[in-house]
Design a protein with these regions (language model features):
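N-terminal helical cap/lid subdomain that shapes the substrate entry/recognition surface
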Residues: 3-110
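A broadly conserved amphipathic alpha-helix scaffold signal in soluble, globular proteins
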Residues: 73, 114-117
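Extended, well-ordered alpha-helical scaffold segments
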Residues: 87-91, 118, 146
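Asp-based, Mg2+/Mn2+-dependent phosphohydrolase catalytic module
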Residues: 1-6, 18-19, 114-115, 122, ...
């Protein structure tokens, strides 16, 4: 089946997430050590987890829940017993610089984008996180000029699996749900969110194993499973 539009998730869909996250953490730890923090990796991981946990608890469902600068702002305050704005800024900047330096597209992404372009298919990226960070990722991956639209949870005010990121993209592209396919790695935010809107869904996990259908509720089950990103050409183009 061909589609008039494909809505891609970004993180752990177009590129593997885990090595980038690890590179970002190493860079942030180095930045904090340069500022005089005597942290081993275990202490850093505890600081990061504390900041992340507090941020998720208080900002869940918003793009801010993913902000590494907020994680470090809160984590450093708990660790040091007082705020350290400069340290949080340095660690957050170092994290994203290290993260982006490690990024690379999954095999097959460029070929799929070529096929979709040749077929005249609209291509959007619909993603949870802040707009500036996601723009940096698209530029780093070299696909910023290959997509027709970026929609972030920050700009629409709601996170997937809310319908709003999906419907905002469809409205901008002037496409109906029946004309579009959503592709992502997360069975809740990507697959269940797309299914609820009436989009066809495809599950592709760039880094890690996809859960079996038997482990999923009906609303989390994708219409298509992709073992390799290049398989999308047969599904969508």
């Amino acid at each position: 089946m061909s589609y008039e539009a494909v809505l891609f998730d970004l993180d752990n869909t177009l590129y593997p997430y885990a090595p980038c996250n690890e590179a970002g953490k190493r860079a942030a730890l180095d930045a904090l050590r340069e500022r005089g923090y005597e942290l081993d990796r275990a202490a850093f991981d505890d600081l990061y987890a504390t900041g992340r946990r507090e941020t998720k608890r208080e900002t869940g469902g918003t793009a801010a829940s993913h902000s590494r600068h907020v994680y470090f702002k809160r984590g450093l305050s708990r660790h040091a017993g007082e705020p350290d704005p400069a340290g949080a800024l340095a660690a957050g900047d170092a994290y994203w610089n290290g993260y982006l330096a490690e990024m690379s597209l999954c095999d097959g992404v460029e070929a799929v984008l070529d096929a979709l372009d040749a077929a005249g298919t609209d291509v959007a990226v619909v993603t949870n996180l802040t707009t500036r960070v996601q723009l940096r990722k698209l530029v780093r991956l070299g696909i910023d000029d290959r997509i027709d639209l970026l929609v972030t949870s920050e700009e629409v005010g709601r996170e997937k699996p809310s319908a709003l990121p999906f419907t905002s993209a469809l409205a901008e592209l002037d496409r109906r749900p029946s004309e579009a396919l959503a592709v992502g790695d997360n069975v809740e935010t990507d697959v269940a969110g797309a299914n609820a809107v009436g989009l066809d869904s495809a599950l592709f996990v760039a880094d890690g194993d996809a859960p079996a259908d038997a482990e999923l509720s009906e609303r989390q089950r994708p219409d298509h499973r992709l073992d390799a990103f290049a398989d999308l050409t047969e599904v969508a183009a």
